[in-house]
Amino acid sequence: MEYLSSNKIAIIDLGASKTIQKELDEDLVKEKIGGAGITTALYEEYRDEDPIVLGTGLLTGTLAPASALGMVTAKSPVTGKICHAPFTLYGGVELKYCGFDYVVIKGSSPKPVYLWIHDGIADVNDGKEIWGKDVWISTDMIREVMGDPLIQILAIGKAGESESDFAQVCINYWASGDRWGFGKLFGQKKLKLVAMRGMSLLEIADPEGFVRKCKEFLSTIKSGPYAGKGGIGELSAAMGEDIRQWLEPIIHRHLSCFNTPFPTNTFVFLDEDPKLLKETEKKEPGFLITDVHGLLGYKKLGLSAAEACDLLRDCAKYGIDAVAVAELSQKAGKKKPDEIKKSLSGLKGSLESVGKGKFSPWAPSFTLSSDEWERRQAVAYLFGIHPIYALMSPEFSEEKLIELANLGTGLGFTSETLDKVIIDILK
Amino acid sequence: MGIKVDPKKCVSCMACELACGYHRDDGFALLSSCIMVTRGREKKDYSAVVLKEEENLVIARPEGLEIRKLGSTGEASSGREKEDASAKPLLLREPCDLCGDREEGPLCLQFCPVNAISMN
């Protein structure tokens, strides 16, 4: 695969602690496009070895608006189905640039390990120093050891190590869109984290045509209904559960994922003045909210915004899905932050908020029907478009994405190709 | 004439960095950009936009702008370690040429989704 690609797949055998590399076959891309199309195909190829597949979409890491998406594809311990969980911020782009479009992690390690994927190399390293540490400390330790604060990390905390059904694979210090208990899978495989860093160059079949078209799309988006807006509060308002006033006093600023026109994340300061402009002296002043559902769950318990965000921070450190914690706390009648914090270890119960399909319910449905939501998610996960942003920008249509994919790769995708792949991955 | 950055509008999406990288490399890469969003202080939510010009290093921080003459004292430490946590330090890259070969002007400006970049 020559364009928009690193042209490599890493196959990592945790049991044997060995990695092999394969080329990304252009015929596979022609048939499956990318992203969830190819992670699903790779899952099926290695199905007998209980794989976790990491991947990026065809347009991830390009100037296509919102091309931020990376994904984890595996069998969910929660639903028993093959599901896809998103990782955004700078994780998707870092995976694309680290030299592999896809990473298959198969088998289990007898001892704690972590993966260090960088510049076309994938190493299995001893993880005994970080096993037992929370997500924040683990991320800090890896970045310090490697001497690079820009390493992007998919990590589990103690929830994953103890194989909780609600364990989440976090991204750096923050919650991800993993609602499938993939953190438990990491824990079962004794895989503490995946560290990614790379400096690849992605070539483009028609560079100027591709960039011109990206610019046109961005121009349309910039005059759309979300122009000038941002943050988790706006998402909640679009969902009909407006928390903007409740959250406002602690907001430091809103942050985008890679090349995403709408900032879907909000950083709140809990131990610092939110209006501070200069660099704080505090090492850990707050939290980046990346999941609106967890926040809404704690608000429903009657907590203040600061209490809710403090709990989100604890959940991320522990590596547990805050949505599950909020729902189970509600059911158990726990409404005080301290008692909720104490319940993280050994949390059990059944959830009603579990996604029923292939794609994480992390992306709100807004006003879409379930069929419309699912198709739009499928498109996002194939092309590598931020799954929330894909729902917010219908003007970024399937036809436009296909046009971009063809300018980028020269492979001649059609709407028939897309329909076929979507049917395949929704099976 | 030069590029002006409003860091209070910036959402740290890196579109400017990738657009600049494309201008340099005719492909998508981040190692040659002369504009970058510093992301090394993630837990503190503190970042700046740094631009290498022909003679200056421009650091647009939320609390204000700093312009350092290239070659001045202190440039190396701040340019390499604090503002610029990258594999290829900004000071080793080509300075901004305002995308002089492009009729529509600088690509970073055109790709900023929140209009944080403008021409001085």
Please place each PLM-identified region on the residue numbering.
Chain A
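Protein-protein interaction/assembly regions in multi-subunit complexes
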Residues: 1-179, 183, 188, 192-201, ...
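Extended C-terminal regions of large enzymes
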Residues: 13, 19, 28-31, 68, ...
